[in-house]
């Protein structure tokens, strides 16, 4: 029985209870639901000074210069704990929140190993969404710019032939969503990962939440056993434990999260208790309050995302939608416009809650409450990043009280109600009503186009391409 050894940093609360890994034979993720057994723990008992630079971690000068160029001044906690172990050739489980610097934590050791032993198909990174895959590839290319690292992004919604050509050029690093990667492994002549040295499963909890388990099983079966594997996740669910046991060899666990529902101190959180029928009016009022600030509005459905985008545009706001049913080019275009601030309002489903590189968000508005506390934390975590301040306001209607109380319970505190003059809000009622009628007209056209597309492609099981996009 191989043990998973835990490594903790000084500010992490000690855990009681433990878990283990199965024997070396490959088992499917679905077969790994056994009760967790006792394991040994390797804890950092001595107080060690925090590393001041990437060079202190063992990163070579060439890559340190790339870090400096990218603005990485000092290692984050997950980088400080993970990189030295990865450089020792250990399999790793990294538990850390979005925005903690996970990508560099696995990219730097892989690039350093690549420099020592250059070869094609050296590393494979699996990601749950297309946007995250492109983002990871960009990080690899930037960090590896001085060594001319070649990356290929293999995701659904893009042309298979052009991707086959890219694979034929034998890139060093492949960043992929599971569905499209498996398509190429099964159908692209001459493509194989038999020589792969590194496998990374990023946002592993989301990979499994999106039903990629069976696809991961098939991918793992064709990868060489003699490889290093890194698994990064925000949470350690039973499904992630199963994936860990199926894919990692004697791993060390690094955790920098002491409370999975913790939010940063620079985030000002509050709520608005309001009638459901007046949500649009309150939304417009708040956007006028925060005019000029970078804002993400979270909704629960694709329909609401589009409707609110139409509503706000008719009122003169620079709003742009982001959801899983947009084409890949439209999604990347929306993110590009929001990052460049040519549009300062992003209306999104939870496709934008985690994993996307949006460096500066001032305000998060939960127009629709999420159904669970974990998603709430990931949503509001889009703002107040890297030491900056941020605001998060949640709309709580008469139908949302129970959900909101659960969220507050998970946070361990009561949040303040956002103060405003309701009479001032309702002054906007007539103007917003006109915009609502305009949005209804535009939604009819939008729904007709969606219906035509659905009929064209027919119904049935979800394709791998559809699984490669977050539904929303």
UniProtKB/Swiss-Prot annotation:
Q: Which residue intervals are annotated with compositional bias (Basic residues) in the record?
A: 452-462
Reactions that this protein is recorded to catalyse: ATP + H2O = ADP + phosphate + H(+)
Taxonomically, which superkingdom?
Answer: Eukaryota
Query: SUPFAM superfamilies, from UniProt?
Result: P-loop containing nucleoside triphosphate hydrolases (SSF52540)
Keyword Iron-sulfur part of the UniProt annotation: no
Q: Where is this region: Disordered?
A: 1-52, 444-472
- Per the Swiss-Prot or TrEMBL record, what residue ranges does the short sequence motif DEAD box cover? 202-205
Q: Which Pfam families match?
A: DEAD, Helicase_C
Q: Which InterPro entries does this UniProt record tie to the protein? A: DDX47/Rrp3_DEADc, DEAD/DEAH_box_helicase_dom, DEAD_box_RNA_helicase, Helicase_ATP-bd, Helicase_C-like, P-loop_NTPase, RNA-helicase_DEAD-box_CS, RNA_helicase_DEAD_Q_motif
**Record-annotated Helicase ATP-binding domain positions:** 83-254
A single GO cellular-component term from the record reads:
nucleus
Q: What remark about domains does the record contain?
A: The Q motif is unique to and characteristic of the DEAD box family of RNA helicases and controls ATP binding and hydrolysis.
Task: Give the record's subunit note.
Answer: Interacts with the SSU processome.
- Give the protein name, as stated in the record: ATP-dependent rRNA helicase rrp3
Taxonomy of origin reads:
Eukaryota, Fungi, Dikarya, Ascomycota, Pezizomycotina
Q: Per UniProt, what is the name of the gene that codes for the protein in this document?
A: rrp3
């Amino acid at each position: 029985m191989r043990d998973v050894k835990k490594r903790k940093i000084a500010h992490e609360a000690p855990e009681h209870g433990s878990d283990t890994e199965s024997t070396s034979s490959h088992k499917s993720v679905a077969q790994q639901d056994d009760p967790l057994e006792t394991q040994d723990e390797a804890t950092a008992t001595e107080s060690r000074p925090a590393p001041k630079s990437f060079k202190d971690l063992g990163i070579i000068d060439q890559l340190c210069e790339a870090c400096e160029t990218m603005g990485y001044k000092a290692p984050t906690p997950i980088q400080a704990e993970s990189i030295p172990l990865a450089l020792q050739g250990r399999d790793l489980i990294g538990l850390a929140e979005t925005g903690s610097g996970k990508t560099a934590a696995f990219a730097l050791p892989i690039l350093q190993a690549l420099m020592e032993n250059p070869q094609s198909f050296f590393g494979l990174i699996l990601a749950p969404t297309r946007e995250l895959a492109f983002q990871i590839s960009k990080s690899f290319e930037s960090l590896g710019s001085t060594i001319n690292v070649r990356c290929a992004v293999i995701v659904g919604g893009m042309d298979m032939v052009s991707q086959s050509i890219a694979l034929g050029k034998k890139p060093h690093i492949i960043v992929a969503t599971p569905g499209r990667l498996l398509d190429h492994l099964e159908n692209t002549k001459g493509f194989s990962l038999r020589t792969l040295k590194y496998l990374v499963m990023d946002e592993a909890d989301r990979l499994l939440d999106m039903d990629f388990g069976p696809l991961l099983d098939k991918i793992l079966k064709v990868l060489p056993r003699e490889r290093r594997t890194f698994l990064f996740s925000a949470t350690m669910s039973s499904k992630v434990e199963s994936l860990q046991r199926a894919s990692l060899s004697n791993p060390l666990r690094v955790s920098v999260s002491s409370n999975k529902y913790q939010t940063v101190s620079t985030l000002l959180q509050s709520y608005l208790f309001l009638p459901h029928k007046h949500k649009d009016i309150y939304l417009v009022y708040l956007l006028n309050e925060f005019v000029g600030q970078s804002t993400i509005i979270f909704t629960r459905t694709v329909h609401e995302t589009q409707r609110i985008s139409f509503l706000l545009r008719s009122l003169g706001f620079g709003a742009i939608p982001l959801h899983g049913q947009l084409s890949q080019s439209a999604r990347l275009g929306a993110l590009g416009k929001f990052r460049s601030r040519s549009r300062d309002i992003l209306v999104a489903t939870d496709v934008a809650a985690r994993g996307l590189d949006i460096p500066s968000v001032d305000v998060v508005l939960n127009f629709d409450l999420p159904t669970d506390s974990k998603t709430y934390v990931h949503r509001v975590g889009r703002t107040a990043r890297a030491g900056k301040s941020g605001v998060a306001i949640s709309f709580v209607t008469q139908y949302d009280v129970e959900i909101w109380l659960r969220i507050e319970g998970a946070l361990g505190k009561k949040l303040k109600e956002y103060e405003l003059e309701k009479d001032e809000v309702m002054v906007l009622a007539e103007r917003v009503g006109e915009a609502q009628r305009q949005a209804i007209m535009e939604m009819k056209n939008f729904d007709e186009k969606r219906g035509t597309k659905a009929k064209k492609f027919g119904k049935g099981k979800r394709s791998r391409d559809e699984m490669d996009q977050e539904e929303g």
